[in-house]
């Protein structure tokens, strides 16, 4: 391999024989020697160890030193790319150990080997530094990504803990029950329910079940209808009592609601003391029924067109007593 490349001992000696004589202590000769000629006792090691020697400057710049001539063999084998490569490697490596300084004095073929394409290869220390910088950058990216992922996981965990704590602290929200659809009763069902309600305002469990079975309804539907109907009946009754109290027809009021009966407090408060006393202390026996209905008699008399007023009705058996006058 050394003979084929032209950098062996024989080739270097043959080039030295063909070149003009150089001074004995010339630093250029000491720099261009092979590592086989170098020894720890040689004085040329001082030339290799000094970074500012003129021989090194001549080799690195590729120009002959003033006062000395370079051989034609060396000029044919030395290229600017080969000479600049050791300088670049030496500038990149900042170590000042003896081992590193002696490594800079290796042969020219080892300093800048030719690539397959004919171009000089990139210096090895620079490539190592670039690869190391890329690896450091990747490590930093991985660390930052892991830190970001851990931070996001920690934030998600904190939000979950806050939601759990807030749900524990806050009272449970009661969901509204879905409103049931109203039952559509038929005319026949409504008529039967109204008849049953006229007979009795409150149904027993057995009567309610029988009525529901006869009308093809559920027990709950019949119960709900009766509750709504009783509410409507009480409201209408309260309005009728107020109208009768305003008109002063206490006898009709007694016929509608025989004693004992629980009258609303609002109705009793609007009545005079005598009427209120009569409502609570009236006769327990029901009053006798009228001999003739009142409304049809008035209507028939109005239809006849008689100018004379209708004859007076016979007096009722139960007459409202007058309030006792204070003496």
Curated annotation (Swiss-Prot):
Biased composition annotated in UniProt, kind: Low complexity: 33-54, 316-327
Keyword Metal-binding tagged: no
Record's keyword terms, sorted: DNA-binding, Homeobox, Nucleus, Transcription, Transcription regulation
Lipid metabolism listed as a keyword: no
Any Gene Ontology CC annotation: nucleus
DNA-binding region: 178-237
Pfam families associated with the record: Homeodomain (PF00046)
Record GO biological process: midbrain development; negative regulation of outer hair cell apoptotic process; neuron migration; outer hair cell apoptotic process; regulation of transcription by RNA polymerase II; sensory perception of sound
Polar residues: compositionally biased ranges: 79-90
InterPro entries listed in its UniProt record: HD, HD_metazoa, Homeobox_CS, Homeobox_TF, Homeodomain-like_sf
SMART domains in the record: HOX (SM00389)
Record region (Disordered): 1-90, 112-184, 305-327
Protein location: Nucleus
Primary localization class, coarse: nucleus
Family: Belongs to the BAR homeobox family.
Protein name per its UniProtKB record: BarH-like 1 homeobox protein
Organism: Homo sapiens
